[in-house]
Amino acid sequence: MSEYIRVTEDENDEPIEIPSEDDGTVLLSTVTAQFPGACGLRYRNPVSQCMRGVRLVEGILHAPDAGWGNLVYVVNYPKDNKRKMDETDASSAVKVKRAVQKTSDLIVLGLPWKTTEQDLKDYFSTFGEVLMVQVKKDLKTGHSKGFGFVRFTEYETQVKVMSQRHMIDGRWCDCKLPNSKQSPDEPLRSRKVFVGRCTEDMTAEELQQFFCQYGEVVDVFIPKPFRAFAFVTFADDKVAQSLCGEDLIIKGISVHISNAEPKHNSNRQLERSGRFGGNPGGFGNQGGFGNSRGGGAGLGNNQGGNMGGGMNFGAFSINPAMMAAAQAALQSSWGMMGMLASQQNQSGPSGNNQSQGSMQREPNQAFGSGNNSYSGSNSGAPLGWGSASNAGSGSGFNGGFGSSMDSKSSGWGM
């Protein structure tokens, strides 16, 4: 007498009841009729909770010792078939995932200022269906920024558009994936290479014919007027990257191949060379307050009264606001300095000083830079400009605006 046993493809699925033969066995053909590709049955032992196989002899499945009972039997498949099925499912899942990620926004660089979004859509519609176009504009003026974005429906259209340059409203434009689409851990790969050391007799056709031996070439561009270089774009970025750094011979001339993408260098902090007592670049002959050797910051009589617009007082930095304040204080101090200088001219001996002809130089007094003096008299309060190695002598104009190599003093001396 036949009975029905419960069979399923997975323990969590709903089972199917299939009939047994009169002798209590089950034909494998009966199982495969419901589960194509099945090669046997297994069940979970109620005692050990382990999976146990059903005995199969010449296409006939024999019941366990206790009979078929109310157990649920799971279908077995050949391992190769199961592996193929799993790979097929995984491949399908990957294809679906890739299909979602394939199309993305492309950036269009080098757009003419007059190009509108409608112009951009009309142009790219010749390649395929366009989902979105956008021309980036300045928020204040409303004028184009010279670039935009486009997205296509089909990935094949996107690849085709990216593989060539585009003449839009009379100007060559590039269309590519934005850098933000690249993974942070993945280097930016370009299909375009820079060909340096070209000669004027090299034509675009000759370059294309030469580089075709490495891979499909989609574009060759030689700037005009001629500037001894060219750009070659391949269909495959791997071909382009493999050529970077190579020196090739074209028409007997050695050319150098490198990446055509702009290099993203970090911002550099430039050192300002015009400092007090420093290098050229300011008002006067040497660009500093004082001469270039003494490191002082006064009115230097060695260099004819140089007055520079430096940025550093030794280790003390000056920003533009502080510099403006210093200039304002300088202008307001000229009157007082002129009056004091007049008093010094009346009391001090005369000499052949190059900065102020009536003043005598003495090596131990300061107004200026280095070891030179401005006044030969000890009368008058020590006020004024500059400091040098002997700025503390107590006569003339000492203290000062600047810094000294020896005394390390700085500020406005009074």
UniProtKB/Swiss-Prot annotation:
Record's Pfam families? Answer: RRM_1, TDP-43_C, TDP-43_N
- The covalently linked position for Glycyl lysine isopeptide (Lys-Gly) (interchain with G-Cter in SUMO2), per the record, is K79, K84, K95, K102, K181, K263
Which InterPro entries does UniProt cross-reference here?
Nucleotide-bd_a/b_plait_sf, RBD_domain_sf, RRM_dom, TDP-43_C, TDP-43_N
Name the residue ranges with Gly residues bias: 275-301, 393-402
Q: Where is the composition biased (Low complexity)?
A: 342-358, 368-392
Modified residues annotated as Omega-N-methylarginine in this record: R293
**Main localisation:** nucleus
PTM: Hyperphosphorylated. Ubiquitinated.
UniProt keywords (A-Z) are:
Biological rhythms, Cytoplasm, DNA-binding, Isopeptide bond, Methylation, Mitochondrion, mRNA processing, mRNA splicing, Nucleus, Phosphoprotein, Repeat, Repressor, RNA-binding, Transcription, Transcription regulation, Ubl conjugation
Q: Where is this region: Disordered?
A: 261-301, 341-414
Feature: compositional bias, Basic and acidic residues = 261-274
Where is the region Interaction with UBQLN2?
A: 216-414
Q: What is known of its domains?
A: The RRM domains can bind to both DNA and RNA.
Write out the function statement from the record.
RNA-binding protein that is involved in various steps of RNA biogenesis and processing. Preferentially binds, via its two RNA recognition motifs RRM1 and RRM2, to GU-repeats on RNA molecules predominantly localized within long introns and in the 3'UTR of mRNAs. In turn, regulates the splicing of many non-coding and protein-coding RNAs including proteins involved in neuronal survival, as well as mRNAs that encode proteins relevant for neurodegenerative diseases. Plays a role in maintaining mitochondrial homeostasis by regulating the processing of mitochondrial transcripts.
Name of the featured protein:
TAR DNA-binding protein 43
Its organism's taxonomic lineage begins at: Eukaryota, Metazoa, Chordata, Craniata, Vertebrata
Gene assigned in the entry: Tardbp
